[in-house]
């Protein structure tokens, strides 16, 4: 969840107006009454949202259309427990009258400017999409949602007839929503046409462990309908999505409705799995601190949900909006319910604090991650998601962050933002949380079992709420530091498909995502925003890591040092993400991690290893003790634009039993 304060502003404004209403007209002089009327008029437009969005990259050549999603929300939210949801009683909103939507397109870059002629999708000579019926605007009482299926051939034809120098691989769209008595609502999107497939390795499937659909629906955050989500995810190169809609926005009926929608959309092209993002009370201070957790269903029955012990028909965990009147469920109670259902969980953005307006905080290493006594990970907790949001840059202009139109202030467009840099946040999260947990998991066992005490896995998720082209946010931290961002919002270059968890599933994802869930539960995954690096021990020396006796990420191997087979590496990148610049091997012990070891990357194989590449670990591990250790790897690439991309593997645990 992205921290925000929209509902706080909404509630504050409503309280002011409510006080004015309570006082009555006679309590004000004429000038004062005029001010009240102005405030009432402004509030009448509060909660009206316009959105236009499209996939950042079109990677599926089988889809001949470019989907542009348009949404208008006239101040109505679905039933939820969010703070301020009852404020609408104070607000009178007139219906909106939609005339239509104009779409303009041009090649990307400042050399080209939009023409005055829209891209026409039908016989209309005025709108790309004409909403009028019999010449009358379409009346919107509460919500309007439509996906404009723009033929790719129409885009190519338009560009060829209006611009020289094609064909063009990157194009800019200007989407103008026209509503009576409102200024034109303009959105600017950048799209890669015919983008190449993402790097792939057989039996590994890309997905997102943290994505919000339209079932996340509150005054602060909303996702997109599942059919829109599915189409965009396929274009982005995803194989599966774990839907993690907020526990504050769900009800038993809505959770069942979401599952019904998921089932209808299962056709073998993209696997949708219904999960949940649960707001919980931290063990540090249940009255003050809330944290978030990604809840995943049982791999044995992905559609089961999380049945309540007293009422098995209620399969959704409903808890916590940050308000004192609706306290969050204790973290341990939620984990108990999830594990009782056969599910598991990941700590969501554990070290990115949630907005203090929502009483949000960070996960505590000792109280939240570890079970009482500090000897084990909390039951049901598989790991953590410190790689949350693929953000490198932010922009003040949340409708044109790419500076597509002529811009008066280029500083309002995407600029590198160290405070939100994904690698800085990820490495800090690894240092604060993952490393200490991995280290504690290497402590000696007291039961005589020859295995690590416990394992903790890493996952990556976009945390996108719709956000197909870029992410639009409102952040209380930026509000306190920069008023314009608090009032007008800002943009991040995060989007669906920009970051993924890649799961190992040799039997495929499964008819309901069973194998995706097993891989997530067992740490058979890597995190990536482009390249893929996998590692393992080929125990039968047949040149494959896909046999049952082979050992891969998330697993362990115990053998004498002299019998330890080479670690086999395999990687793949592409021109889009650039050749491998480095592979770092990191060894972790019960006293901490050793300095990274640079693994040589043959220049001829910088884009792809083209099979397994062996690495002898015996020299690296020769001084190790006969206790459990782990190894993990980080690969980095750099493309022609000097952008860096990475892949982080989960560990392999190793015990050397002798010389």
Segment roles from a protein language model:
Residues 218-220, 284-288, 356-363, 394-404, ...:
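Histidine/acidic-residue-rich catalytic or RNA/ligand-binding cores of hydrolases
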Residues 199-372, 378-379, 385-396, 427-432, ...:
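A metal-dependent hydrolase metal-coordination microenvironment
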Residues 1-11:
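Bacterial N-terminal signal peptides that target proteins for export
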Residues 385-446:
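Substrate-binding surface in catalytic domains of secreted glycosidases
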Residues 28-200, 440-659:
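C-terminal functional module detector
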Residues 9-20:
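Bacterial N-terminal signal peptides
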């Amino acid at each position: 969840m992205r921290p925000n304060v929209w509902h706080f502003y909404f509630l504050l404004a409503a309280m002011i107006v409510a006080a004015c209403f309570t006082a009555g007209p006679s309590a004000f002089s004429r000038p004062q009454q005029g001010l009240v009327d102005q405030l009432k008029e402004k509030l009448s437009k509060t909660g009206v949202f316009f959105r236009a969005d499209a996939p950042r990259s079109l990677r599926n050549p089988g889809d001949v259309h470019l989907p542009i999603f348009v949404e208008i929300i006239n101040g109505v939210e679905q039933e939820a427990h969010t703070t301020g949801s009852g404020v609408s009683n104070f607000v009178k909103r007139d219906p909106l009258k939609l005339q239509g939507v104009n779409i303009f397109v041009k090649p990307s870059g400042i050399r080209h400017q939009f023409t005055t002629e829209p891209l026409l999708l039908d016989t209309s000579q005025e709108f790309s999409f004409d909403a009028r019926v019999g010449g009358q605007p379409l009346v919107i009482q509460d919500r309007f949602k439509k996906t404009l299926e723009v033929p790719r051939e129409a885009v190519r034809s338009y560009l060829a007839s209006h611009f020289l120098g094609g064909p063009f691989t990157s194009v800019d769209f200007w989407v103008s929503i026209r509503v009576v008595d409102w200024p034109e609502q303009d959105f600017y999107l950048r799209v890669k046409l015919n983008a190449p497939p993402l790097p792939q390795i057989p039996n590994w499937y890309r997905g997102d462990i943290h994505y919000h659909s339209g079932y996340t629906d509150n005054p602060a955050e909303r996702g997109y309908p599942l059919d829109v989500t599915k189409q965009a995810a396929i274009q982005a190169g995803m194989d599966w999505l774990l839907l993690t809609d907020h526990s504050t926005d769900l009800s038993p009926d809505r959770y069942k409705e979401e599952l019904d929608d998921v089932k209808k959309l299962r056709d073998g092209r993209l696997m949708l799995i219904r999960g949940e993002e649960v707001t919980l009370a931290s063990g540090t201070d249940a009255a003050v601190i809330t944290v978030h957790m990604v809840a995943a269903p049982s791999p044995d029955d992905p559609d089961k949900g999380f049945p309540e012990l007293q009422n098995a028909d209620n399969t959704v965990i409903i808890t916590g909006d940050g308000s004192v009147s609706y306290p969050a469920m204790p973290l341990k109670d939620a984990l108990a319910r999830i594990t009782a259902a056969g599910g598991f969980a990941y700590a969501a953005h554990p070290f990115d604090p949630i907005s203090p307006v929502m009483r949000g905080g960070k996960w505590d290493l000792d109280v939240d991650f570890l079970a009482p006594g500090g000897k084990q990970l909390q039951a049901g907790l598989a790991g953590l998601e410190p790689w949350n949001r693929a953000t490198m840059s932010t922009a003040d202009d949340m409708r044109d962050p790419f500076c597509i139109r002529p811009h008066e202030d280029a500083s309002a467009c995407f600029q590198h933002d160290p405070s939100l840099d994904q690698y800085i946040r990820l490495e800090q999260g690894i240092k604060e949380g993952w490393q200490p947990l991995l280290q504690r998991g290497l402590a000696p066992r007291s039961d005589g079992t020859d295995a690590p005490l416990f394992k903790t896995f890493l996952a990556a998720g976009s945390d996108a709420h719709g956000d197909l082209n870029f992410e639009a946010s409102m952040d209380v931290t930026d509000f306190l530091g920069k008023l314009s961002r608090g009032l007008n919002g800002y943009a991040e270059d995060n989007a669906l498909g920009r970051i993924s968890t890649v799961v190992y599933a040799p039997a495929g994802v499964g008819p309901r995502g069973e194998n995706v869930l097993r891989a997530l539960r067992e740490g058979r995954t890597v995190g990536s925003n482009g390249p893929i690096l996998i590692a393992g021990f080929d125990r039968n020396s047949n040149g494959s890591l896909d046999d049952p006796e082979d050992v891969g990420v998330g697993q362990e191997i115990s053998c004498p040092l002299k019998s330890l087979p080479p670690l086999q590496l395999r990687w793949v990148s592409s021109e889009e993400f650039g050749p491998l610049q480095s592979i770092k091997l990191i060894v972790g012990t019960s006293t901490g991690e050793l300095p990274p070891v640079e693994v040589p990357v043959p220049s001829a194989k910088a884009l792809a290893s083209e099979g397994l590449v062996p690495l002898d670990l015996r020299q690296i591990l020769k001084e190790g003790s006969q206790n459990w250790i782990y190894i993990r790897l980080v690969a980095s690439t750099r493309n022609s634009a000097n952008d860096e991309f990475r892949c982080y593997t989960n560990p392999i645990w190793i015990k050397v039993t002798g010389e």
